[in-house]
Design a protein with these regions (language model features):
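Hydrophobic "anchor" residues on beta-strands that sit immediately upstream
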Residues: 8-10, 64, 194
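Short active-site oxyanion
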Residues: 38-42, 62-63, 127-129, 191-192, ...
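Conserved acidic, metal-coordinating active-site core of Asp-based
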Residues: 98, 102-208
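Short, structured coil segments at secondary-structure junctions
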Residues: 59-62, 69, 77, 147-149, ...
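Active-site phosphate-binding/coordination module
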Residues: 20-119
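Mg2+-dependent phosphoryl-transfer enzymes with acidic/Ser/Thr/Gly-rich catalytic loops
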Residues: 3-6, 25, 169, 174-251
């Protein structure tokens, strides 16, 4: 069996890089910085672009980063959007109207800015909508109710795995799309990219890369889609993944 040759690293944010309080451990920060000295590194998150750019800058990452569940690629140094794929306006308006009718909290990214109520939307160039759900069942029902053929829908959880989100992006747009775009612009071979995550919205990314790695606290269906499983967030699992699949092979 040929040795794995790492060419890049993609890391989920909540539950992988940071905890519920948005804290990053020192071992994880050191490991990410060490990896970035060897291969292109990007955060791949469902979060809004400002959050992704903030943590990328903390780590000194300079290559394009992935926000909005793959619908937005950004320059972390300037915060400028390099590439975006909004969902159809009819879908975004329909989803927002229904969420507000039901009294469900959500956030959306419209033209790169976060909106949490209909009054905050401006151009309806919406790349992602993430609606809060009390549990997995409620999340799945929401996705089924509001889905359409022009959308990609996926559940996700917060860093602690306690809160669920129903995520909506344009059809064909996911962290998997973001991984392909990242590989193209950085020149990293997809077969050599290490992707580390803990939630369902990481599954499309796992399907695209050569080394999908699940965090130890990830749900069974996420672990089963991974090639390897590392320690949990509390055990600095991301640092373990970087040591095993980036630093050691390139030492």
């Amino acid at each position: 069996m040929p040795l794995f040759k790492p060419t890049g690293l993609l890391v989920d944010l909540d539950g992988t890089l940071i905890d519920r309080e948005s804290r990053m451990s020192r071992p994880v920060a050191r490991a990410v910085k060490a990896a970035a000295a060897l291969v292109p590194v990007a955060i791949a998150s469902g979060r809004e672009p400002d959050d992704v750019a903030h943590f990328a800058r903390l780590l000194g990452l300079t290559c394009p980063q992935i926000a909005d569940n793959g619908a937005r690629i950004l320059d972390p140094m300037t915060g400028r959007t390099l590439h975006e794929l909004p969902m159809p306006e009819l879908d975004s308006r329909r989803i927002v109207d229904e969420l507000e009718t039901r009294g469900i909290k959500y956030y959306a990214v419209d033209g790169g800015r976060v909106a949490r109520s209909r009054a905050e939307f401006t151009g309806w160039s919406v790349t992602v909508i993430a609606a809060h759900a009390v549990d997995r069942g409620a999340c799945d029902r929401l996705l089924a109710d509001l889905s359409s053929g022009s959308l990609h829908v996926v559940p996700s959880t917060d860093a602690g795995g306690s809160y669920w989100y129903a995520n909506f992006t344009r059809a064909g747009v996911s962290k998997g799309y973001g991984a392909r775009y990242f590989a193209r612009v950085t020149g990293a071979d997809l077969a050599g990219i290490v992707a580390v995550g803990d939630s369902h919205n990481d599954l499309p990314m796992f399907a695209e890369v050569g080394m999908p790695v699940a965090m130890g606290h990830a749900r069974p269906e996420v672990k089963s889609a991974a090639a390897e499983v590392v320690g949990s967030l509390d055990q600095d699992g991301l640092a373990e993944a970087i040591e095993r699949f980036i630093l050691t092979p390139l030492s």
